[in-house]
Regions:
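Short, contiguous alpha-helical
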Residues: 11-25, 33-74, 114-167
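Acidic catalytic patch
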Residues: 101-116
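A general secondary-structure boundary signal
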Residues: 6, 17, 21, 89-93
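Helix-adjacent hinge/juxtasegments
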Residues: 61-103
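A structural signal for long alpha-helical coiled-coils and helix-turn connectors
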Residues: 26-29, 100-103, 147
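Extreme N-terminal tail/first-helix region
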Residues: 1-15
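A short, structure-level motif marking secondary-structure boundaries and short turns
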Residues: 6-7, 30, 79-81, 127-130
């Protein structure tokens, strides 16, 4: 019988990051700030917000499909904050379900990141899922900077913020 030590740990970690990610995303007035960029080389706020909402779905693709091709990866067309939140919640459910249904043997299998069919790199799924959770945290942090620059209050994430003293 295959163990679920890694899958359980990754699922618990993902579940820890989701509430604060949700609190950030639900504060974004996407319709108003979609095209905001703090610098000419920065991502637009709409793209960054969608990226944060989509990252959990990557976990499901890693487990179930064993590859992601960023050239052909389908991105949702999101125009409203309501659509964004529905998309995020759906992606979280898919990630959680995939982790619940996987076992540690599954996570030892190889994941491939591709660009237009060309393999960019491969590694065990457990490594890339862990990196993907880090990626979510990184871009959520980036999003909080965009929020601050637009006068949007920053929620408590790992502790109180200047705007939210709850913990």
């Amino acid at each position: 019988m295959a163990t679920k030590i890694f899958t359980t740990g990754l699922l618990e970690e993902l579940k820890m990051e989701i509430p604060s990610t949700r609190k950030c995303l639900e504060r974004i007035p996407l319709e108003k700030l979609f095209h905001f960029k703090p610098h000419e080389t920065s991502m637009e706020m709409g793209y960054l917000t969608l990226l944060v909402a989509e990252i959990p779905l990557w976990i499901a693709h890693m487990i179930e499909d064993s590859e992601i091709d960023f050239v052909t990866y389908p991105h949702e067309k999101i125009e409203t904050s309501e659509q964004l939140m529905a998309h995020f919640e759906d992606n979280v459910k898919k990630a959680e379900t995939s982790l619940l249904n996987a076992n540690d043997d599954t996570l030892e299998e190889i994941f491939s990141l591709k660009a237009n069919g060309e393999v960019m790199y491969t590694s065990p799924k457990k490594i890339d899922i862990r990196t993907t959770i880090n990626h979510l945290v990184h871009h959520r942090g980036q999003l909080t900077v965009y929020m601050r620059m637009n006068g949007i209050s920053i929620p408590s994430i790992y502790g109180p913020s200047a705007d939210d003293k709850s913990f």
